[in-house]
Amino acid sequence: MSTDILRKIEAYKREEIAAAKARLALDELKARTRDQSAPHGFLKALEAKRAAGQFALIAEIKKASPSKGLIRPDFDPPALAKAYEEGGAACLSVLTDTPSFQGAPEFLTAARQACSLPALRKDFLFDPYQVYEARSWGADCILIIMASVDDDLAKELEDTAFALGMDALIEVHDEAEMERALKLSSRLLGVNNRNLRSFEVNLAVSERLAKMAPSDRLLVGESGIFTHEDCLRLEKSGIGTFLIGESLMRQHDVAAATRALLTGAEKL
């Protein structure tokens, strides 16, 4: 996404945040987070898969995208969550942004309740209020996109997540963002293989940036991962955890496609 697109997203997000705060005061929202059961360990679930010698998949529930339009017409978040779990995914990622991705908070809540997998709120975050929202909807992890926030806001979002017992996935797409991300505490780093300005996707981005990450960080390959062979390629660079959405969302049998992607049992 270009800088201009990110600015437009931030503009409508800040309008959404203001409207949400007008509807529900922060203190009341915080009370709702206390009604939730404790977060399931998102990072812990990924590390458990890797420790068992398996690829760790964050499987994404995504109805549409700005670049591809409608991805899955028969969109059923609980059924998709169960299919991903059956196929061997470690965690879920659920789009909650409506204007760009046709996502919704209720998709996250429904998917999270349908299975035992920890869930990420996949959205553009610009205010700690949104972290409390995520927790109140049942999310176990948030996404912090370094391209869209400054260092102070990134730390504020991360601190809020940690205070709520959540994990934070820090997303980067170039060396400068990786350097900034490494100043944060989270061990969960996502490398987006999509150039946010040209939309070009290249797995070499993950391969290049992986060299910058200390061994205590868990790297997640994002975008452009379609086959088991793609997973094997990134594993050579030390990346065995992946966030994958579109390629699985387009499959008729999501559970079988997930299993094939992770194990190479059959071609997708």
Curated annotation (Swiss-Prot):
Q: What UniProt keywords apply to this chain's record, in alphabetical order?
A: Amino-acid biosynthesis, Aromatic amino acid biosynthesis, Decarboxylase, Lyase, Tryptophan biosynthesis
Catalytic activity of the protein: 1-(2-carboxyphenylamino)-1-deoxy-D-ribulose 5-phosphate + H(+) = (1S,2R)-1-C-(indol-3-yl)glycerol 3-phosphate + CO2 + H2O
One short Pfam name that applies is: IGPS
GO terms in the biological process aspect are: L-tryptophan biosynthetic process
Name the Gene Ontology molecular function terms of this record.
indole-3-glycerol-phosphate synthase activity; phosphoribosylanthranilate isomerase activity
PROSITE patterns named among the record's database cross-references? IGPS (PS00614)
Pathway membership: Amino-acid biosynthesis; L-tryptophan biosynthesis; L-tryptophan from chorismate: step 4/5
What EC number(s) would the UniProt record show?
Answer: 4.1.1.48
Q: Which family does it belong to?
A: Belongs to the TrpC family.
Q: Which PANTHER family is this protein grouped with?
A: INDOLE-3-GLYCEROL-PHOSPHATE SYNTHASE, TRYPTOPHAN BIOSYNTHESIS PROTEIN
Can you name this protein? Indole-3-glycerol phosphate synthase
- Species source reads Brucella ovis (strain ATCC 25840 / 63/290 / NCTC 10512)
